Each structure stands twice: as C-alpha cells, then as structure tokens.
Amino acid sequence: MPVKPAIIPGLRYKDAPRAIDFLCDAFGFERHAVYPDPNEPNIIMHAQLIDRGNLVMLGNGTDNEYKRKAGIKSVAEAGGATMGLYVTVNDVDAHAERARAAGADIFIEPMDQDYGGRGYSCRDPEGNVWSFGSYDPLAPA
C-alpha cells in the first residue's frame, strides 16, 4: 500500500507533557498518540498531535543515539529558534485569541498579508516559532 505523502515536523521539548497540553489548549491540536517512558512518566519518548489530518511529532530532548548523531537541539540549546512552522487556519483572529489566552507569546499580531490572507506569529513556552494564517500556499492559483 502506498504511503500518503507528508512532511511531519519533529520537535524537542524539555518539558514535553507541558508542551503537549499547551499545543492542544492554545493551537487546537488533539492527542493522537503519547508514549511516556515506562520508568519515568514525565518523560515523553514520542508523541503525535493531530490537527485536521496534519501531524506534529514531539518528545523530550533526552539523550539518545539519534539526537547525538543528528545534532538535534532544543530551542534553548540552540540559543534561539532555527525554524518555524506554518499552519493554515480559517479564523485567524479567533485562533490568535485562543493562543494568547493559553499563554502564547504573540510577536506579530494578526494582520493582512501582502501576498494574500491574514496571519500572526507566536512562540510556544519553549521558544518554538509558530505562524498561523488563512493564506493557503497549496490552493490552486
């Protein structure tokens, strides 16, 4: 059976349980799968959060072979965000208010974009950059 084409971001958090709660409360993700360490339930080995068929994977930034070989760093370890995520939403202003109420650091308020649509940008509690907008880059031109 063919695999559905997808690019799935993987994020590392110092406090993954808190990040999962935040991403669900602030951005509307739902828990698809959460696998805590059987010996340390506050350590999330792997989690999958879903939003309208799109997936984000995350876990604690625990030391393991993959992290060492790939050089993966959290935002704090890197000294700042090294990438940002863009998520399409229908009601940008309502989404921003939900995110703000949950504690998101909104550094670009909702605004109309020159290239179309409306959007805003924020940081989650560990500094990952998220942008949300109504501009759909995959829509037919």
Kindly give the residue locations of the regions a language model identified.
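Vicinal oxygen chelate
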Residues: 1-10, 20-123, 134-141
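Conserved beta-strand-loop-alpha-helix junction that forms the acyl-donor binding cleft
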Residues: 13-15
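C-terminal catalytic core of tyrosine-transesterase DNA break-rejoin enzymes
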Residues: 126
